[in-house]
């Protein structure tokens, strides 16, 4: 009986993906993210609020979904929004290639095509990589889940404030403002 061996995708394969979407390298597979309108609107609303706060207070660098972060697991993940504190890049030079460190904040915005298992896998991987704050925002349900660890988890509704806590000091916005 013949067996077939599946070749694991590499970072080189990821570099050679077409420019028609956002791809991640996860456990030797190339995965493409399919985002909808509510996903894009919510992500951009958050960046429009978070970005100026980070720049004004010189807290660090905010990145969009096309930025790959090479995690200790070897996976290259592209959070919808991510933040890296000032002082973490050598000489404060942001790399032109993938970011070779775990963000301080990752944000995943839920899309209709997302499976709960994929989201939880991402959250677990981010936390295991040392990301101190993870937000999962669901525009369809108008809620967010805030993770500091797998046991320190809070649910937020549209009237609750999404806060940067000690990771993005002073940042606060009403969650519902991201959906309106």
Language model features: what each stretch is:
Residues 1-180:
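Gly/Pro/Ser/Thr-rich low-complexity, intrinsically disordered segments predominantly at protein N-termini
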């Amino acid at each position: 009986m013949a067996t077939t061996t599946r070749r694991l995708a590499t970072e080189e394969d990821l570099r050679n993906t077409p420019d028609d979407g956002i791809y991640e390298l996860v456990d030797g597979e190339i995965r493409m993210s399919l985002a909808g309108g509510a996903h894009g609107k919510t992500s951009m609303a958050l960046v429009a609020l978070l970005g100026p706060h980070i720049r004004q207070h010189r807290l660090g660098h905010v990145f969009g979904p096309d930025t790959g972060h090479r995690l200790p697991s070897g996976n290259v993940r592209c959070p919808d929004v991510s933040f890296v504190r000032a002082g973490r890049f050598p000489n404060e030079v942001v790399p032109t290639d993938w970011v070779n460190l775990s963000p301080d904040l990752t944000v995943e915005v839920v899309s209709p095509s997302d499976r709960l298992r994929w989201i939880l896998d991402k959250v677990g991987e981010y936390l295991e990589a040392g990301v101190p704050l993870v937000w999962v925002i669901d525009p369809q349900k108008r809620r967010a889940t805030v993770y500091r660890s797998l046991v320190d988890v809070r649910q937020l509704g549209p009237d609750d404030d999404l806060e940067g806590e000690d990771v993005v000091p002073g940042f606060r916005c009403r969650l519902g403002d991201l959906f309106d």
